[in-house]
């Protein structure tokens, strides 16, 4: 499958998180593995078998509204029954999507079953984020 894309305006971080989940699940074909939208820090875990159908991609998007961003984590596997991931990756202060809670912001999403690339525009500054498969050598 080819890339899908969208560009819209989100009213805040919470709105963007839902729009991101809806786009990846409804348009691109990712699976909602775990819905933690009722938590103090709402999150969604999305899963994909990749473009090849042989991958295991688990991405968790967490509304880290205390600092105007969505934290992104990757896992080797996600257990939806216990709400826990195995072999967490991307757990640093640099793996996030920059957002803002105080005002609306523009965003662009480009994605397929392997990759997710997001650009947000906060005031006059553009922020980019990539997550998904890394190129194998």
Report the location of each language-model feature.
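Long, leucine/valine-rich, helix-dominated scaffolding and oligomerization segments
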Residues: 4-137
């Amino acid at each position: 499958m080819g890339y899908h894309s969208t560009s819209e305006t989100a009213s805040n971080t919470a709105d963007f998180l839902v729009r991101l989940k809806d786009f990846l699940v409804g348009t691109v074909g990712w699976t909602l593995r775990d819905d933690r939208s009722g938590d103090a820090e709402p999150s969604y875990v999305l899963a994909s078998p990749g473009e090849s159908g042989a991958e295991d991609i688990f991405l968790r998007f967490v509304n880290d509204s205390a600092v105007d961003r969505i934290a992104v984590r990757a896992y080797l596997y996600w257990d939806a029954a216990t709400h826990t991931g195995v072999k967490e990756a991307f757990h640093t202060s640099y793996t996030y999507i920059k957002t803002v809670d105080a005002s609306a912001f523009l965003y662009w999403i480009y994605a397929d079953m392997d990759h997710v690339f997001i650009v947000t525009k906060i005031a006059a500054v553009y922020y980019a984020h990539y997550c998904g498969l890394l190129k194998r050598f």
